[in-house]
Every structure is written in C-alpha cells, then in structure tokens.
C-alpha cells in the first residue's frame, strides 16, 4: 500500500501525476491512500490561498494588519446593506501605516464598518466607491489578510484621505447582484450533482463571479451522459423560485441537519448555514446570495473535465451571460445550417459524413502518393553507387513522411542488405 504522504510527495516534489501513480500501483497490485492524498492536497490549496491573499494584501504588512486587528474587528454589514456610514481606522501604503493619502495614490483602507464583501469562499470581492466630504475613492479589491479585518484596496480619485475621516462606503449594486446569482447557482449545481451522482459528489473547490461559476467535485467517472440532465434540473430548480435563507447555528447542529461543508475547510463552533428550498440544499457558507432561486435567471453549462485524480470540474454561465452564451451558440448553429444547407437536427450527421469523406480522401491521396513514390523506385535504384562493398544511394525526393518510409524500405529491398539508403 502506498501512503497518502508518499503519493503527495511524488506529486508535489517530483511532479509525478497522481493518475500515473494510481495506474502504476494498480499494475503492481498495490493500493494508494487516495483519501490521505486528497487531504494533503486540500491543505496545500489552503496554504496557497493564504499565500495568495498575503501577496495580494502585501505580505510585509502582516504585522501591520495584526496591529490594526488588535484595535478591533471590522463589522461586516454586507448581508443586509450595500451602503454604510463608517470611519477610517487605518491606511496602509506599501506595507506601512500612514496617516493620509493624496489623489492618485493606491492604498489599503480599513474601516470600522463595511458593506463590502471580501474575497473568500470562492466568491470574488465587491467593488464600488468610498465617498466623503470632498473625498472619493474607487474600491477595486477587498481582502481579509487576518481574521476579522477587511482591507479595501482603493485608488484615491479626489480629495485627501486621513485616518479618522467619516466616509460612506457604497457597494456596486449590479456587480454584487451578479455575484449573488453566481454563488447561489453554485449551490444549485452542487445539490443537483448530489442528486444525480449520490452523496459522494462532494465539493472539492469552487469559484464564482458575476455571470460565471466553476465547481469542482469528487467523482471517479464524471457526468458522462448526464450533462444535459444537470443543466435541465438546475434550471428547473431556478424556475421553482426556491426561497434562499441563512442563519447562524452551532456546527454540530448544522451537520445534524445535513449541511454540506467544504472538505479541508476549518470552521468555528458557530457557523452560517445557507438553505435553498429548505432541506433541498444546505451548505455552510459565508457568501452572499439571492433571496430566491428564480433571481438567478438561467444557467448554461459550458462543459465538464477532469482536473485531477477523482476530481471533476463543471463550468457554467449564469443570468445574462447564460443568455448571451445561448445566443452565440444559436447564431453558430444558424450559420452552419445555412452553410451546409441542412436542418439543425441534421448537423451532426452531416458533419460526421463530411469528416468520413475527408478521411477517405486523405487515405486515397496517401495511397496515390505511395504508388507514385514506388513507381520511381526502379529509376532511383539505378543511381546507387558501390562504396567499399556497399550499395549507397543518396537522393533528394519530395515526398511526405509515410511515403518516404515506404520508398526507403522498397529501395533497401531492391539494393539488398549490404546497402545504405539516404533520402
């Protein structure tokens, strides 16, 4: 038996794919601790995310963030409000605490209260503006470099910003609405996957932003012919206009209710559970969501693929992006039907027939080229010279790879074993 730690070392240190480890182990009658491998991979992903957040927020500012955090947590108001009056607690520039910032500066701002959602749980951060008296700044990113502290990356466009300023934080409502649609659609996809594949189809990762979602799940074989059913059942759940609610409760109680947790994720004793249609979908989630599934609008599946041993990925467009995706596909089908002069339901058959004809034509051309090359063999053989007891033939010919091999072998046969042919 190959332990999960050894399989992970082969993958992480030596770049040996887990798929190949599984295949070679099976050939030798050995088992691989896949659960242990996945646990170590989850830990690595968590470390990578933490490192990415540190780099995004400025790793050198970690102690600065910790210092600001000791002065108090940021109160997040974004579940209910998209605007909030607040106070500037700190300004960070290039990893150093500063007292003020000028127009054109890009700095990080910590507020006492914020409606801005910080990137986490696979959901992109909010964008928007922070305004004050003669003051304006664009919020381009929000991170939580240390627990409880929301750090807003801003570009100051007007006025001078100072610690202690009273400001109004305003989230881009359209961008937030798109993020809510995509995140709720991710929960829909998760619930339908478990409905189709069973309880082993657990979440292995996700990413969602306005108009798009990506969802990784545990599965050995993937969806196969169930892709259309996944899309159809997901859109049925959207049309059912299921109520989406959230509540905080003890972790043990949430698990007893069947709430799904992200593999490898760490949770506190009290968690936030998001429900969609009551027990139909229950997940531990800190993200923002629509009030009802009907607000998602539409989901259009892009495709499914393998992203590792026992892990599959589905991608989909959501809401207006889904409608635009379908419109592009319809335009493509229309162009093809006009070009090939067939009905839409005959497209696959026509293309398959054309591909078959193309392959047959390529084989015919290859056979003709080979015949022409062989027809030249007798003439070419006549140009062979005797060199030290060997029949040597060197010639430049214009033929493709397969025909060149056929011609060379024919000439070797004509000239005998004591010959050298260089074409």
Residue ranges and their predicted role:
Residues 1-423:
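A glycine- and charged-residue-rich anion-binding loop/surface
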